[in-house]
Design a protein with these regions (language model features):
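Asp-box/WD-like beta-propeller blade repeats and closely related beta-sheet repeat scaffolds
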Residues: 135-154, 158-159, 168-212, 219-223, ...
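Beta-propeller blade signature
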Residues: 124, 180, 228-229, 265-267, ...
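Surface-exposed loop and turn segments in beta-propeller and other repeat-based domains
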Residues: 80-84, 133-148, 189-200, 275-294, ...
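Sequence/structural signature of beta-propeller modules
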Residues: 20-139, 162-164, 489-490
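Conserved beta-propeller blade signature
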Residues: 106-110, 164-168, 214-218, 254-257, ...
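Blade-level signature of beta-propeller repeat domains, shared across WD40, Kelch, NHL, RCC1
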Residues: 462-490
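Loop/turn-rich, solvent-exposed surfaces of beta-rich toroidal or solenoidal domains
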Residues: 111, 308-312, 351-459
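Repeated scaffold domains used in trafficking and secretory/extracellular systems
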Residues: 91-100, 140-158, 196-208, 241-252, ...
Length: 490
């Protein structure tokens, strides 16, 4: 199966370098209805208000999850569904899964590929033409690495306030790349070697700055948690001997990391070394569920106002788990605020961050997704989207709604608190070989699907864990294996 799909994927990806105006080839037109629902009026919902990390680009444009609290939320409007314009744009081979925007409105991304090393790109947000590239160092992946579940080497990166890309490489370095004001060049500004604290088969999953300017980083294998001082180049680290396959979350005075076993709060010790300030084991079935990278939580932790942080565990059925972020609890408080089961047993898993809107969390079901090389790559996934709210006293939670109709295989969805809509990317049940993908909007208030519109069919329109993004003008963007798809109101 793998050998059969490799040429297919390569054919889907290989397009001319200057391909901004060309649509993605749609090899299997859909047989299902291409537009359902109708435009809605905006319904403002309460918003989480993450602080601005001074070391990162302005919220919500600094990383795949928008801000250092990883809320996946926008305070401005995305499409409402009026005269929707859905387009596709072919690009040079790579998947630009993390989309950020620089101070001049250009798309900035780091794009892993199966046919070349990761490539940093500047992309025109209007034409989707690639304006500049930088080929990043590459290295052979450790044995046993699943090609399309490997987020090292740029899958996670962040953009700072000076329009600089900070990205880990597959060679276990941290590169700092300057994007020119006109977007026409990318130049290397710094290169930090982190191999002194990493073993040969360890790769950096993610690197992020704390509010004081230190750069934290984590490795998947072995669970190394490290700190780099960019000024002195001093590196300190500890090893958890667990797996860390997600990115992490940064608050003003702490860093929150979830491993395949536990939820952690970290601080900085007197020696400058990472120190565990609290940790909590979560429920775990021990099963690597279909769509998951390992037998553990699939979420990057998400903080919301009031001192709460959420993940999903790996129980069956899966729970939304909410913790208190505080280092020390007040009298009568418990570390775990709630554990709320969502989606049916044997059919619940997520490999994406939870969305936050004040005291509401929104969670997507990815159970059953197989990467493009998987034996069931053409099959639809299990349905499910849910909302869980923290009560006003902060002492418990409840499930507000579940939508068991939408099937979102792997996208990082987003919520607009200005429209009250959740934006996701779904697959419809259709005849085998059809594989239609849709832009889909849900009501954050009720969970009902309000509209959806056809994006394209087949492998070129598979987003494979890429994150949806809303541009400054409200246009929705999503990387797919064939390039990028966009959606906006007419």
């Amino acid at each position: 199966m793998i050998h059969r799909l490799l040429p297919l994927l390569a054919a889907a990806l290989v397009v001319p370098a200057a391909a901004g105006a060309d649509p993605i080839t749609n090899p299997v037109p859909t047989t299902v209805e291409t537009h359902q629902g109708a435009a809605v009026t905006a319904q403002l919902i309460p918003a989480t208000t993450p602080p601005q990390n001074p070391q990162m680009a302005p919220n919500p444009w600094s990383n795949i999850h928008n801000d250092s609290w990883m809320t996946d939320a926008y305070a401005y409007a995305g499409p409402l569904g009026k005269d929707l314009i859905a387009e596709s744009h072919s690009m040079p081979p790579a998947l630009c899964g993390s989309i950020t925007f620089d101070s001049h409105g250009h798309i900035v991304s780091v794009c892993p590929s199966i046919v070349q090393g990761p490539q940093a790109r500047v992309i025109d947000a209007k034409t989707l033409e690639v304006m500049a590239t930088y080929n990043m160092p590459t290295a052979q992946d450790p044995p046993g690495t699943k090609m399309y579940q490997n987020f090292s080497g740029g899958g996670y990166f962040f953009l700072d306030g000076q329009d600089r890309i900070w990205s880990a490489t597959k060679t276990s370095h941290l590169l700092v790349l300057q994007v020119a004001a006109d977007g026409k060049s990318i130049t290397e500004e710094a290169d930090y070697d982190l191999t002194s604290v990493l073993e040969g088969d360890q790769r950096i999953t993610s690197a992020l700055p704390d509010f004081q300017g230190r750069i934290w980083f984590v490795s998947k294998k072995g669970g190394t948690v490290g700190i780099l001082d960019p000024k002195s180049k001093k590196i300190t680290s500890i090893k958890l001997n667990e797996e860390i396959e997600n990115s992490f979350t940064v608050d003003r005075d702490a860093v929150f990391i979830v491993s395949d076993k536990r939820m952690y709060r970290f601080g900085v010790g007197k020696s400058g070394k990472p120190v565990v300030q609290w940790k909590k084991t979560y429920k775990n079935s021990g099963i690597v569920k279909p769509s998951q990278v390992n037998a553990g939580s699939g979420t990057t932790p998400t903080i919301t106002n009031g001192g709460f942080i959420s993940i999903t565990d790996n129980a069956d059925p899966m729970n939304v788990v909410v913790y208190r972020t505080a280092r020390k609890l007040k009298k009568g408080q418990k570390r775990v605020v709630c554990e709320v089961p969502i989606f049916p047993a044997g059919k619940s898993a997520t490999e994406n961050s939870i969305l936050a809107a004040k005291r509401s969390f929104f969670i997507e079901n990815n159970y059953g997704y197989q990467d493009p090389f998987g034996p069931n790559s053409g099959a639809v996934t299990e349905a499910g989207f849910a909302r869980v709210d923290i009560n006003k006293k902060g002492t418990g939670c409840k499930k507000v709604w579940e939508n068991m109709d939408v099937r979102a295989p792997s996208v990082v969805p987003k919520v607009s608190t200005a429209t009250g809509l959740i934006y996701t990317y779904t697959r419809e049940e259709a005849p085998m070989g059809d594989q239609p993908y849709f832009w889909t909007a849900l009501s954050a208030k009720t969970g009902k699907t309000v509209w959806k519109i056809y994006a394209g069919s087949g492998l070129p329109f598979n987003n494979n864990y890429a994150g949806l993004a809303l541009g400054p003008d409200g246009t929705a963007y999503l990387a797919v294996t064939g390039g990028m798809v966009t959606l906006k109101d007419g």
